[in-house]
């Protein structure tokens, strides 16, 4: 690789990231003005998806909800990313799909947040989980069709094995990746700074992979997201001034799944995002165990609440998860380098 060209590419990616960070910082006071004036307070969940009272969760986070912390701050990041991408990093082949996923996932999350703020909905104070799942699935199907028909993708790379030709079956695999990732990220957004930090790590790793693959515009998009997330983290680190809400978690999760497909690193996604897998997996295990065996595996799920329940301070859980996320990111990058993805 020509050193001068690579240096120029790095500069371009760096400028996109800085631009997203600065624009997000500039837009944040606008959001906070409206959020506090019109009381975008996040309503506390009182019951689980099975209809049971969340006694442990309520006890752990009672003081947080007493502070009336606004939600829906993810919309700031979405606006900044959309503006920077459309103005400086637009490509039908590389950035249209992840941006569409970001906006589409954000729209689903926004609807859920609005219902949550208005205090309607049962138990989880928002859209029913089944309805959110259906909406994200429909979005993923539309994106998967574009991925296969318009962009011509029809295979996946399996580390250390080779290319697996799927033809039209790439679409259901695409849907599985996007729906799973969006829900896993949404489940992980439960502690101050947790989801924002883990997403920053994951997008950084995928950005490096894309850069090494010479997908400059995908790399630029990834680091645009990182810039916006770092701006959000400035205010979301404990004690959080606001939450990203479902508008953020669904947007970033949906787009992350698309990035994994575009960089042909789907099978590295569970490694790089291992904590997203652990969070979603712990919730699923808890639900299945209570439904079929009548007992809980974890004191509280997802797993970050379990660690809180056994006495870990919220900040310790978050920072240790960040450390694990960094290690997983390095392992994923190494697998990408050695497994034939670059």
Name each model-derived stretch.
Residues 2-277, 342:
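"…together with the soluble PPM/PP2C metallo-phosphatase catalytic core" -> "…together
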Residues 66-76, 310-321:
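Loop-to-transmembrane boundary segments
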Residues 151, 331-342:
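Juxtamembrane boundary at the C-terminal end of a transmembrane helix
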Residues 190-198, 295-318:
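Solvent-exposed interhelical
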Residues 7-8, 12, 16, 308, ...:
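Peripheral (non-transmembrane) domains and long loops of multi-pass membrane proteins
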Residues 31-34, 114, 288, 299, ...:
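Hydrophobic alpha-helical segments of integral membrane proteins
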Residues 316-336:
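Final/C-terminal transmembrane alpha-helix of multipass membrane proteins
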Residues 40-48, 280-300:
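Juxtamembrane non-transmembrane "cap" segments at the membrane-aqueous interface
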């Amino acid at each position: 690789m020509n050193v001068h060209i690579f240096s120029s590419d790095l500069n371009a990616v760096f400028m996109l990231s800085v631009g997203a960070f600065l624009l997000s910082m500039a837009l944040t006071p606008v959001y906070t003005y409206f959020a506090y004036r019109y009381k975008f307070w996040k309503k506390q969940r009182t019951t689980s998806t099975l209809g049971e009272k969340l006694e442990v969760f309520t006890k752990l986070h009672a003081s947080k909800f007493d502070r009336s912390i606004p939600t829906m701050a993810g919309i700031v990041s979405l606006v900044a990313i959309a503006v920077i991408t459309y103005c400086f990093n637009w490509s039908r082949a590389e950035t249209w799909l992840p941006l569409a996923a970001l906006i589409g996932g954000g729209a689903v999350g926004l609807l859920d947040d609005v219902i949550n703020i208005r205090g309607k909905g049962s138990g989880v104070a928002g859209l029913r989980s089944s309805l959110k799942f259906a909406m994200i699935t429909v979005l993923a199907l539309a994106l998967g069709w574009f991925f296969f028909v318009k962009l011509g993708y029809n295979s996946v790379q399996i580390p250390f094995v080779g290319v697996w030709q799927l033809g039209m079956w790439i679409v259901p695999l695409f849907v599985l990746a996007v729906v799973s990732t969006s829900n896993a990220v949404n489940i992980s957004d439960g502690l101050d700074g947790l989801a924002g930090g883990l997403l920053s790590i994951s997008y950084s790793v995928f950005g490096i992979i894309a850069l090494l693959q010479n997908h400059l515009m995908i790399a630029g998009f990834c680091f645009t997201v990182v810039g916006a997330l770092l701006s959000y983290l400035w205010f979301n680190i404990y004690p959080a001034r606001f939450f990203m809400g479902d508008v953020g978690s669904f947007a970033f999760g949906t787009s992350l799944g698309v990035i994994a497909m575009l960089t042909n690193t789907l099978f590295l996604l569970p490694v790089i995002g291992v904590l997203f897998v652990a969070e979603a997996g712990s919730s699923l295990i808890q639900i299945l165990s209570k439904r079929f065996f009548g007992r809980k595996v974890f004191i509280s799920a997802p797993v970050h609440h379990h660690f809180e329940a056994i006495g870990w301070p919220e900040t310790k859980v978050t920072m240790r998860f960040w450390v694990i996320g960094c290690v997983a990111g390095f392992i994923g990058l190494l697998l990408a380098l050695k497994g034939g993805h670059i």
